């Protein structure tokens, strides 16, 4: 309720979008956690989408309702144990921002031994997955990696991958120190259109598509 009241206050003050961060269940072993009503995929998804649906009702049409989601849920069919089910989230948000930082993906994702070494490929494939699954029901605007040793080339590769799919983007650096050489000028990027090229088959290698709760970005199961 407190978060919803803050969102309403921000919208009344003229903010045009409220992005809810870390709206999820703990990414931990649920066998040692206790929740009112239990913790099944159905209850988790219902809880998270229920909160966002109420937020959208209370702040709209003054504000857009946005949510950060874990990046790996773009490419798994379940909720990842945290209540993030992409198709359901698309119905209750105006904007979804997957945190698809390449250094968060384990060996084997998208066919890469080291996904961190393929920043453009990780963004391209994960975004194609989420665009196919949401089918225009919400705007996709990913968080991209500007930390962990990435320089201008790696940052720009991610931006170019998002831009090529008609997507806007945001950069994350915990200290708000950004790689200036990797950020394009305004006339070097497209106006977001979210009209991507035909989606190609990008399912992860065998063993990844149905990720058990709390496994997340980990190695092959």
Located regions from the model:
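Generic structural signal for well-ordered alpha-helices
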Residues: 7-8, 45-56, 86, 123-131, ...
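Aromatic- and acidic-residue-enriched carbohydrate-binding clefts of CAZyme catalytic domains
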Residues: 26-43
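Active-site-adjacent "subsite" loops/lids of carbohydrate-active enzymes
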Residues: 1-9
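Substrate-binding cleft of secreted/luminal carbohydrate-active enzymes
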Residues: 93-107, 116-207, 212
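Alpha-helix N-cap and loop-to-helix initiation/capping positions
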Residues: 2, 39-47, 80-84, 114-122, ...
